[in-house]
């Protein structure tokens, strides 16, 4: 009896479970090795599924289950520290043009949905932390503390602290991985995220955002009175990945206490969310991407190759697209009917990096820009965020098209029925209700500069609050 091609998936989160569902569609054998004891732990996190990730989930029979447990976003209300606010219809515009709503739900619930669709649950092994990978001529071996697993391809879906990425570096020729790549990730921001329940004044379908100096707060509502929130703060300096800061529960608590008076809406303060908080965590926000995604029979996807901030909401969606490209490449290589040699494996993995690296670079740049714009990092961004951004009304929805447009699809499953034909981005902008011609934008820029120079009433410079926040990190 001939040996079947097997994929060893390191990590049983979004990317790992999505890949398992794809491999089941392709009738390709796999094993998932998840270091945690629970495949869907409650860590206080939420997840945003965007229209570039939704079609793949739709093809896998997952999105209907997601849609049943969300409150679709319809519009956003963005507030500034001087009390000014404006509303944007960007969530409704995006849903109308792509056929899928922006969907927020508990990360735990999303993982439960993915896991419920797995047919061969006996192939999912929890409590199995990979500690070493051996690459042989025609196969690979993954060793955990007490077991070993053999296969023909290792996929690192194991997050930012990826053991698979470390093993790719270890197995590479001397000098192949540069010092620049090893230090590609850096940390300038941190995030306190949490889930609250029963917060009065938070309306279904409305995103609340506060763009303050050095602090950004985003709030999304879910089913059954759940409220998901993120507090993104700029920390005291830039850290490298190898020297990134660690945060305690007390750090997070003190930061949230210091923000209680911040108004998110006319009748909702951050203190209202904090008083009803069920669970919260704090984490540094790594930013950046790696150039080397694979070597031999090892490959990385998702957070193992790029890190984005929550501001752009693309971490999970980019991972889902990675999986779609990898699964399509395996489908075209017809690995189910034979064992591919090293050259054929390299061809498959090269398709992934060639397709996804350009999108990664673009999205990382957009994430970095948006994070700093929303935090008012520097006088020019403060001016743009306060005066230019509101004047554009719904036009920023069109800029989202650059990330969402051209989302990957599975070639071996029927096309998603509800996905709509993509529109030209410029035509989309013209159709928006809040369209502002380019010359007017220039006038607004000049007006903003004059207003700032004449009155000095733009956002305050670092205050006692800002100093307090930074002192905790």
From Swiss-Prot:
Belongs to the paxM FAD-dependent monooxygenase family. Its cofactor is FAD. It is an enzyme of class 1 (oxidoreductase). It is a single-pass membrane protein. Pathway: Secondary metabolite biosynthesis. This is FAD-dependent monooxygeanse terM. InterPro entries: FAD-bd, FAD/NAD-bd_sf, FAD_mOase_fung. FAD binds at residues 34, 48, 107, 303, 316. Its main location: membrane. It is found in: Membrane. GO terms for molecular function: FAD binding; monooxygenase activity. Its EC number is 1.-.-.-. Disruption phenotype: The disruption of the whole terpendoles biosynthesis cluster abolishes the terpendoles production. The chain crosses the membrane at residues 441-461. Keywords: FAD, Flavoprotein, Membrane, Monooxygenase, Oxidoreductase, Signal, Transmembrane, Transmembrane helix. One of its GO terms (cellular component) is membrane. FAD-dependent monooxygeanse; part of the gene cluster that mediates the biosynthesis of terpendoles, indole-diterpene (IDT) mycotoxins including terpendole I, terpendole K, terpendole C, as well as the kinesin Eg5 inhibitor terpendole E. Terpendoles biosynthesis begins with the synthesis of geranylgeranyl diphosphate (GGPP) by a yet unidentified GGPP synthase. Residues 1-22 form the signal peptide.
């Amino acid at each position: 009896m001939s040996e079947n091609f097997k994929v060893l998936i390191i990590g049983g989160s979004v990317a790992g479970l999505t890949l398992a569902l794809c491999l089941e569609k392709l009738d390709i054998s796999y094993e998932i090795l998840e270091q945690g004891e629970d495949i869907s732990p409650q860590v206080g996190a939420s997840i945003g599924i965007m229209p570039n990730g939704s079609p793949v989930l739709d093809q896998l029979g997952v999105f209907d289950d997601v849609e049943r447990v969300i409150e679709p976003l319809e519009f956003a209300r963005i507030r500034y520290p001087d009390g000014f606010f404006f509303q944007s219809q960007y969530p409704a515009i995006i849903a109308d043009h792509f056929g899928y709503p922006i969907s927020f739900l508990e990360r735990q619930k999303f993982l439960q949905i993915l896991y419920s669709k797995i047919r061969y649950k006996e192939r999912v092994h929890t409590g199995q932390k990979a500690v070493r990978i051996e690459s042989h001529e025609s196969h690979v071996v993954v060793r955990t503390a007490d077991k070993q697993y053999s296969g023909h391809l290792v996929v690192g879906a194991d997050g930012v602290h990826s053991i698979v990425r470390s093993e790719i570096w270890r197995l590479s020729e001397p000098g192949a991985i540069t010092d620049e790549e090893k230090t590609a990730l850096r940390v300038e921001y941190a995030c306190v995220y949490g889930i609250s329940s029963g917060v009065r004044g938070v309306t279904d379908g409305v995103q609340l955002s506060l763009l303050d100096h050095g602090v950004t707060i985003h709030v999304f509502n879910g089913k059954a009175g759940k409220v998901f929130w993120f507090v993104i703060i700029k920390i005291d300096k830039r850290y490298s990945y190898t020297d990134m800061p660690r945060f305690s529960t007390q750090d997070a608590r003190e930061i949230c206490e210091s923000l209680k008076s911040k108004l998110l809406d006319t009748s909702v303060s951050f203190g209202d969310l904090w008083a009803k908080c069920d669970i919260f965590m704090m984490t540094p926000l790594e930013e950046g991407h790696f150039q080397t995604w694979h070597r031999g029979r090892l490959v990385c996807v998702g957070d193992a190759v790029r890190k984005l901030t929550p501001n752009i909401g693309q971490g999970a969606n980019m991972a889902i697209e990675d999986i779609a490209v990898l699964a399509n490449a395996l489908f075209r290589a017809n690995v189910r009917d034979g064992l591919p040699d090293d050259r054929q494996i390299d061809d498959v993995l090269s398709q992934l990096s060639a397709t996804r690296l350009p999108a990664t670079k673009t999205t990382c740049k957009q994430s970095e820009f948006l994070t700093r714009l929303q935090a008012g990092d520097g006088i020019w961004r403060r001016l743009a965020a306060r005066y230019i951004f509101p004047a554009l009304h719904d036009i920023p929805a069109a800029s989202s098209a650059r990330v969402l447009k051209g989302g990957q699809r599975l070639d071996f499953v029927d096309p998603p029925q509800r996905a709509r034909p993509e529109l030209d981005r410029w035509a989309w902008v013209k159709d928006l209700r809040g369209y502002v011609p380019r010359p007017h934008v220039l006038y607004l820029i000049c007006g903003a500069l004059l207003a700032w120079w004449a009155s000095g009433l733009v956002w305050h410079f670092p205050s006692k609050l800002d100093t307090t926040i930074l002192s905790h990190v």
